[in-house]
Design a protein with these regions (language model features):
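Conserved, helical-rich catalytic subdomain that frames metal- and/or nucleotide-binding sites
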Residues: 171-178
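Short, exposed beta-strand-loop hairpins at the edges of beta-sheets
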Residues: 224-225
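Short strand-coil-strand connectors
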Residues: 62, 218-219
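Conserved NTP-binding/hydrolysis module of P-loop NTPases
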Residues: 167-169
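Short secondary-structure capping/turn micro-motifs that flank functional sites
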Residues: 157, 220-221
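Extracytoplasmic thiol/disulfide redox context detector
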Residues: 2-9, 15-165, 179-182, 186-212, ...
Length: 240
């Protein structure tokens, strides 16, 4: 008798939880549909999920985080910070969204450079006409015991594509790349060979790489921009 009563109560709780879950899922879909309608076709809403603040929802547009209310009346751009701990919840969430699997990268599509024992690994997405990429490359010359994979993505201008082809198709792609990025020696040659540029561009689109330089470490973390060498070394140290 007691067992039957317990099972009956458990069944009621399970049904209640299921119904609550269904209601939450339905609410999220309604908010997503309303936000998508208001933003139009130029912005793709990937997902809408409850935010850690009561009454707010996280809206993921592309790889960018926004927030909205339950009626999808407002779109909020900003960061949520937990006052008790000082933790930037939005920043942490953004880092998780931007993370990739290192194994998803294709080394054959990159210019590979090994220094010292090559034990530390770094992937860099670069455009040959990117000023910040040139600044980064000068800093990266200070690194040792590292393997750097440089993925060329010509996103800045038509000339970027031509330079990328000339670099990739040269007899020594890494030397040609560094000669241009660090020493200012313009690549020569016709650049007529099979290149991985289209594959690199497709990868960039899939993973939301919209600017150069963009760096990735073996834990999948993403660092955009001309990162300071001290920050790169600090990140390497954290991976040990």
């Amino acid at each position: 008798m007691i067992l039957n009563k317990f099972l009956s109560t458990l069944g009621i709780i399970s049904i209640a939880l299921f119904c609550a879950g269904q209601a939450h899922a339905q609410q999220e879909q309604q908010v997503k549909a309303e936000i998508q309608k208001k933003l139009g076709s130029n912005a793709k809403v990937k997902s809408v999920t409850p935010a850690p603040v009561s009454g707010l929802y996280e809206v993921l547009v592309g790889n960018d985080i926004f927030y909205t209310d339950g009626a999808a009346k407002y779109l909020i751009q900003g960061e949520i910070i937990e006052l008790a701990s000082g933790k930037n919840i939005t920043e942490q969430r953004q880092a998780d969204i931007n993370r990739i699997k290192w194994s998803d990268l294709t080394p054959a599509n990159a210019i590979k450079n090994v220094r010292g024992n090559g034990s530390r690994q770094l992937a860099v997405f670069s455009d040959p006409n990117c000023g910040y990429c040139k600044r980064l490359e000068k800093s990266l010359q200070q690194l040792d015991n590292v393997t750097i994979y440089t993925y060329l993505i010509p996103i800045l201008s038509p000339d970027s594509a031509q330079k990328s082809k000339q670099i990739w198709c040269s007899s020594d792609p890494y030397k040609t790349y560094i000669d241009w990025m660090v020493n200012g020696i313009t690549p020569s040659g016709k650049g007529e060979c099979s290149t991985p540029l289209d594959k690199n561009m497709a990868f960039a689109k899939t993973y939301g790489i919209t600017g150069t330089p963009t760096l990735f470490f073996t834990d999948g973390s993403r660092f955009p921009g001309a990162v300071q060498i001290t920050d790169i070394e600090k990140k390497f140290s954290s991976l040990k």
